[in-house]
Amino acid sequence: MILSVRLSRMMNRLRNLITDVPGLTVGNAHDAKVGTGVTTVLFDEPTVASGAVLGGAPANRDFSCLEPDAAVPGIDAVVLSGGSGFGLDAASGVQAFLREQQRGFAVGRTRVPIVPQAIVFDLLNNGDKEWGRYPPYRELGYAAASACSEEFDLGTLGGGYGATTFDLKGGLGSASAVTSSGYVVGSLVIVNAIGSAVIGSGPHFWAAPFEEGEEFGGLGMPQRVTPAMRSIGWKGGPQLSTTIALVATDAALTKAQAKRLAIAAHTGIAKALRLALALYDGDTVIAAATGRQALRNEAVDLIELAAVASDCLARAIARGVYEATALPYDPAHPAWKDKFAPIR
């Protein structure tokens, strides 16, 4: 009874954002002319994290630090960025911000901020990519780190600014939940999928069975899913895409346990997108544990954390598409609300 009352109070306080997990903040910055942006997550203190890359076309930075056998015990920030390989400059801007705060892994008399990063390919969204000698991502990374807060918007901003799916505008999504044992789980995602978040050509989200309330429209599933609606719609070639995410919890995990959480969270991508983990996607999930609560029943807690993280990521993906607005280019992918909102 005491636990159920506590859970009820916790759920009532949720923002439905990853920042419901204590110990982290989120900031966003974008360049509307270029059609790209950066999302940064700052941790209050060095945080246990690991990651899993299951897509066929990834690009990332400092992922070796996330392996369970790596010496670095914790990370200072995570960057989710547009820009493909050019976007990997964003972590340098975040490192510069953290260095000013005297944050980072201590090595002798100096500190090196540990900032793993994943990127999405948004170079073909009709934004102006003629940026001159150097791309804008280092400054965008610094700006996103400077803007970190517990409150942030979803949709067309940050690393999701230039994101698209097969048929709709993609974007930045987030969601949160509480396990039955009282651990907070949150997800943050850039939805730039090679496939689709909706069923067929209609408004219903593949993630509908996991929706909480009406967080992405409340339409549920269609009355019938026909073979035509199950057909594979995708961008149609090696136009590298990618869905990248961070899942976080306030549970205390080891790096090995965090890696298993990242692997399990990938099933949330498969729940919410058709296609997922494809050859031309670089689907990547980082899992972080801020360690505010010790595990009380390790086997049970880890299983439930994995299940809730998966569902949470599926919901965040749908929210990223649902909240997106179309880019100001011609042509541009339509936003879900522009295409489907009148039916509600």
Across the structure, where does each feature detected by a protein language model lie?
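A structural signal for small-residue-enriched, beta-sheet-centric alpha/beta enzyme cores
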Residues: 3-7, 11-85, 89-92, 99-344
